From Swiss-Prot:
Pathway it works in: Pyrimidine metabolism; dUMP biosynthesis; dUMP from dCTP (dUTP route): step 1/2
Record's protein name: dCTP deaminase
EC supergroup of this enzyme: hydrolase
Gene (name only): dcd
Species annotation: Histophilus somni (strain 2336)
NCBIfam families per UniProt: dCTP_deam
Positions bound to dCTP: R110, S111, S112, L113, A114, R115, D128, V136, L137, E138, Y171, K178, Q182
Subunit structure: Homotrimer.
Amino acid sequence: MRLCDTDIERYLDQGIISLTPRPSNEKINGATIDVRLGNSFRVFREHTAPFIDLSGPKEEVTAQLDAVMSDEIIIGENEAFFLHPGELALATTLEAVKLPANIIGWLDGRSSLARLGLMVHVTAHRIDPGWEGKIVLEFFNSGKLPLALRPNMVIGALSFEVLSGTAARPYTSRKDAKYKHQQSAVASRISEDK
C-alpha cells in the first residue's frame, strides 16, 4: 500500500525513511514528497563512436563508456545546467535517501516539467528496498528549446510502498550492488552485470 502524506511525515519523524537534508513538511503532498536537483551532472562527450556494444567483453564495454561519458560536472548554486533538445544527461537529487528493507520507493517527474519536454527518469524510477544514497536522474529533453536546470529546484517527487514482508536481499546487503551509497552522477556500470 502506498504511504499517504501523514504516514510519510511519521516515517520521516521516526527515522524509518530518511531524506538528507530533510525537506520541510510543506513539501509532502498527498502521497509524495518533493525532491530537489543536486549539483552533480554527467553528459555524453562529443565522440565518433558508431555504437556501444553492450554485450561485448566487460573491458571493452568499460573502455567504450569511458570514451563517451564526461567526468563529473559540478554546477555552482547560482549557475544553470543547460540541457539541449535531444540530449541525455545524468544528475542527482540534492537529497540522499535511505530506505529500510521493507519499503520500496518510486520517483516521478513533475507534470510541469514534462509539459516542457523534460523527462526526469528515462526508465529507472524504482528505489530498491534497503537503498542508501542519492538518486541518479536520467534527464532527456524531448522538447524544442534548451532547458536551464538549477541546483535546488524541485525536480520530482518520491512515493513509498510497504512491501508484503522484509526483503531477504535489500540493496545495501547485495555484493553485486553497483550503485551502493552513490553521492554523485555515477555513469552506467553495465559492464559489471553478471
